[in-house]
Regions:
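Noncatalytic carbohydrate-binding groove/subsite architecture in carbohydrate-active enzymes
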Residues: 1-112, 171-177
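Active-site lining segments that contact anionic ligands and/or coordinate catalytic metals
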Residues: 16, 65, 122, 150, ...
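A structural signal for short secondary-structure junctions
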Residues: 61-63, 118-120, 181
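Hydrophobic pocket-lining residues within nucleotide cofactor-binding pockets
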Residues: 73, 130, 183
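Catalytic cores of secreted or luminal carbohydrate-active enzymes
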Residues: 112-129, 134-177
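Residue-level detector of conserved catalytic or cofactor/ligand-binding positions
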Residues: 178-186
Length: 186
């Protein structure tokens, strides 16, 4: 990680205003603690890319700040095994139609907080897919419904406006096998 971003920025710094990021998180192991700690992975990813942008800026004695566009992010794993069973070349099969649970909503909320916490550099953030395919809204012949991940997204879109305040509460260490644990700030 990082060498591609550094190389591209080193060559094209003057032409770049935003660096695009994509990230999806899943819970294939069924470990709630590790899954919910994925927002720490997102936080580290953003911080790492910001450091790369700033390193290239310093090397070039640049004036402009390169910001981030988190073009694609979401929770995606529920439909993986089901989609592997699809026949090839079938016309418009239902696929990637994850049905989300409360755990997923908690992670989406944490990811949104992470994006807000980095609002100084993440200027654009787009949840990947909004209807049917890994989406907060599902449709069928009989209507539409909101999934669990809809609610943190909706609440953030309504209340996450204006100036982002860096308020933090220090909590005990959160044990996770995937993401290095440190005192967690919420």
């Amino acid at each position: 990680f990082g060498s591609w971003e550094y190389t591209v920025l080193d060559e094209a710094y003057d032409q770049v205003d935003y660096l695009s990021l994509h990230q999806y998180y899943g819970n294939a192991s069924g470990d709630t603690a590790d899954f919910l700690a994925s927002s720490k992975g997102m936080d580290d990813f953003i911080s790492g890319v910001v450091s790369i942008c700033d390193a290239v800026k310093a090397k070039k004695h640049g004036k402009k700040q390169i910001n981030l566009s988190f073009d694609e992010w979401n929770v995606w794993y529920h439909s993986n095994e089901q989609d592997k069973k699809l026949e090839k070349w079938v016309q418009a099969p239902h696929q990637l139609e994850d049905v989300y649970n409360f755990e997923d909503a908690l992670l989406v909320g944490s990811m949104l907080i992470t994006l807000l916490r980095h609002a100084d550099r993440v200027k654009i953030a787009c949840m990947a897919q909004l209807v049917n395919v890994i989406a907060p809204i599902m449709t069928s012949d009989t209507g539409a419904w909101r999934q669990t991940i809809f609610y943190p997204y909706m609440l953030t879109s309504v209340f996450g406006r204006g100036t982002v305040l860096n308020t933090q509460v220090l909590t005990p260490i959160y044990l996770s096998l995937i993401h290095i644990s440190e005192p967690t700030r919420h």
